[in-house]
Amino acid sequence: MLDLARLDQLQNASVLVIGDVMLDRYFIGDTNRISPEAPVPVVRVAHTEDRAGGAANVARNIAHLDGQAAILGIIGNDTDGRLLKDLLIKEKVHSELLELDDARTISKTRIISRHQQMVRLDMEDTFPVAQAESVKQRYAELIEQYNTVIISDYAKGTLACVGDLIQAARKAGKQVLVDPKSKDFSLYRGATVITPNLSEFKAAGGDASSDDAMLSSARAMLTDAGIDTMLLTRSEQGMSLITPTEHHHFPAEVLEVSDVTGAGDTVIATLGTLLSAGFDLKDAAWLSNLAAGIVVAKLGAATVSPEELAARASHQWSAKTSGYHPSVEQSLLHIDYARQQGERIVFTNGCFDILHAGHVRYLAQARALGDRLVVGLNSDASVRRLKGEERPVNSLEDRMEVLSALACVDWVIPFGDNTVENDTPEQLIKRVNPQVLAKGGDYSIDTIVGADFVQENGGEVAILPTVEGRSTTGLIKKVRG
């Protein structure tokens, strides 16, 4: 079972990042008029901000997670290079940046107004292949000091010897994670994990026309390139962790998108830090997905702290973020993950129109039968068919929010669309596949919907007593006088 308390112990992670470093510069201000010189908006700059970018952003993400981070890359002997070094020192990143007299530090300047990026200005050189040899030599001297290597490829020349770097790390017993830029994934042969986004996956020949096609082509790519695992980032579709024999999908966990800049850096930094600290690959991927959801709600190339990650993980684990209700598919994925972690899933259902003490006591009893409680909740249309035209008193959204606030409830999933046949939770029970099916009232097991399915699959059915004198109908009559 995933222990979130371990997120307080990431100081044990030691990660060497090697790749193309750059300086991210932001000009931020307001826009309220069009220039008289050309049909373009005028931004009145209120403030500027400089941040470590590219591979250096990966390193700073590791440092903000409390991991030990080092960055190896190339900069120019210039003002931006010195500024980048100073930024990394402030963020507690050990920098091994090789200076070139005849090159300039890569920088990307973004003009931002009202949380929108309006234009980006790139100033960059591609470093000569000969300099990659200098990087390779310093890498050989550093590699023994770290247990995980992250290769952050932006195709600027730092990683011209990438194959040699990977082989040296694997020979030394290190995990190697690669954020690829090349269309030829075989350049990263021997990597432990590769983390392409959907565009990079397609550019490398991946087929994303369907989930089955994606899995098939991803596995073929892993086999052809000699790579162990792929963590495919799929934007609003979440992430997919794929090996030659298994796969896991993690739905996107984003409440608000402000800026996607650097989200891929956060993913590989979080994954590398957690793997370095001894986390299971699947747990590390799930948490990396949550980290991406946190960072895209921030402006620019941002970072995530262990406290933010732990808080988001605990919220998403039981879907209790205020005002947030995951989709049915998201909830089912969370439930499946909990079951894989050895947790006992309990299911019950009802209308729960006006929540009262009888409901609360019953739900607490149901939760006590296992580790996680799933509540199937009749839709408004379903309640109306079952209880009459004046019901429900409270809308589905309100009922979901009230139930989700209870400590004993982990997931609330609505059911019962526009047909009478769906007024029972039978199909939902089959999808949840609980170890325990709980029902309150004077029932016999053979009259409980879904009981036969649960028992056939090794589960049990529990009939719980109701609280005398407590009912929604009684409350409504009492209010009406």
UniProtKB/Swiss-Prot annotation:
Disulfide-linked positions: none
Functional note: Catalyzes the ADP transfer from ATP to D-glycero-beta-D-manno-heptose 1-phosphate, yielding ADP-D-glycero-beta-D-manno-heptose.
Name under which the protein is recorded: Bifunctional protein HldE
Matches recorded under PANTHER family: BIFUNCTIONAL PROTEIN HLDE
UniProt signal peptide: none
Span list, region Ribokinase: 1-320
Gene source species: Marinobacter nauticus (strain ATCC 700491 / DSM 11845 / VT8)
CDD domains: RfaE_like
Family: In the N-terminal section; belongs to the carbohydrate kinase PfkB family. In the C-terminal section; belongs to the cytidylyltransferase family.
HAMAP family: HldE
Location of region: Cytidylyltransferase: 347-481
